[in-house]
Amino acid sequence: MLSRSVASAVTPVSSSSLLPNSKPIFCLKTLSGYRSSSFCGGCIRKINHKPLRMTSSNITPRAMATQQLENADQLIDSVETFIFDCDGVIWKGDKLIEGVPETLDMLRAKGKRLVFVTNNSTKSRKQYGKKFETLGLNVNEEEIFASSFAAAAYLQSINFPKDKKVYVIGEEGILKELELAGFQYLGGPDDGKRQIELKPGFLMEHDHDVGAVVVGFDRYFNYYKIQYGTLCIRENPGCLFIATNRDAVTHLTDAQEWAGGGSMVGALVGSTQREPLVVGKPSTFMMDYLADKFGIQKSQICMVGDRLDTDILFGQNGGCKTLLVLSGVTSISMLESPENKIQPDFYTSKISDFLSPKAATV
C-alpha cells in the first residue's frame, strides 16, 4: 500500500496557463474536485498543491543548460538508479536498439539498480517481461512499470471500492493489471466489435456501477466506446476519468510514428469537457510509487528517455537527473529549437554511449 503522499491524484494544468507552443503537463493534487464524498471515504489527505505552470520563472538555470554527455562514467558514478523509457530507448517496435544488452550488463556490473518505465498500456508487466526475454534481455518483472500497472496501482492507492466497476477503453494490458489488483471491469477489446444502430428515440444504456473510466492506447477504438465512456463519466456520480498517458505518437513499428494514446484520451476530453487524471509520465505518480517501493532517493536517480514532454519532464518533476537519447522521437534540432522549453541535463545519441568513458559525438 502506498503512502498517502503517493496516493494524491494527478490533476491537469489548463492549457491557458502554459507558455506558447508548450504542451499540457500534469502534477499531483487532491482528488476532492473529482470524486464524491461517498467515494473518498477519508482515504485521501487533502493537500494544497498549486498546479504546476511552465513559466519563465520556474524554468531553472539547470534546465536551461543542457550539455552533451561527454563523460559517461561521471554520470554513472553520480547516481544509484537508472530509470529507462522503453520505446525509442531500449527498442523501436520489435527491434532492439544497438548496444542495449551490453549497456545494461555493464550498469548491473557496476551495482546500479535498473528500472524500466513505459507509457504503453497495451501489455501488463508480465507481458512486457516476455517481450524483454524475447529480445534477449534479462529483466525481472519487478523492474518493469507500465502505465497499465500504474492505473491499477492508482486505484489501489485511493482504496477504490471493490463493489464499483472500471470501464476500460484500452487493450489487454489494462485488463490483466486490473484483474490482478482484484477490480471488476468491463469494456476493453471486446467492445471494439460493438456498433450503435441509431433509431429515433434510441437511448443507450450504461452500467451505473461504473466508478472509473480508464483510457489508454486502443487499436479497437470506436464510437461505441466513446459514447459509453462519456455516459459513465457524465452521469455516474463521482466517476473518475483516468488516462494512462497522453502521448501524441507511439512506435508500433520501426518504420514510422503512429497515433498514440493521447488521441483516444482527447476524444473523451472533447465529449465530456473533463480533463483526465493522468497516471503515466510525466505525472509524478509512478516516480513517487517507485521511490516508495524501492526506498530510492530521487536525487540518486537518472531518468533516461527519448521524449522531452514525457520522459524528461517526468524526471524533472521528480527532481532527478535527466538524459535525453536521440534514438527515438526527439532530434537534435527539436532539442535546440527556441520553442522547446524542456531541457534535459544531458543528451547523447543512444544509451550504448555509456560504454565509452567519453561518449560518442552526436
Swiss-Prot record:
GO molecular function: phosphoglycolate phosphatase activity
Key words, A-Z: Acetylation, Chloroplast, Hydrolase, Phosphoprotein, Photorespiration, Plastid, Transit peptide
Gene3D superfamilies: HAD superfamily/HAD-like
Enzyme class: hydrolase
UniProt-reported outcome of changing G260S: 60% decreased catalytic activity
EC id: 3.1.3.18
Matches recorded under Pfam families: Hydrolase_6 (PF13344), Hydrolase_like (PF13242)
Positions of post-translational N-acetylthreonine modification: T55
Residues found modified as Phosphoserine: S356
One GO process term, biological-process aspect: photorespiration
Deletion phenotype: Chlorotic primary leaves soon after germination and plants not viable when grown under ambient air, but normal growth under CO(2)-enriched air.
Catalytic activity: 2-phosphoglycolate + H2O = glycolate + phosphate
Domain of life: Eukaryota
UniProt transit peptide range: 1-54
GO cellular component entries: chloroplast
Active site: E80 (nucleophile)
Subcellular location: Plastid, Chloroplast
Role description: Photorespiratory enzyme that dephosphorylates the 2-phosphoglycolate produced by the RuBisCO oxygenation reaction.
Family: Belongs to the HAD-like hydrolase superfamily. CbbY/CbbZ/Gph/YieH family.
Protein name: Phosphoglycolate phosphatase 1A, chloroplastic
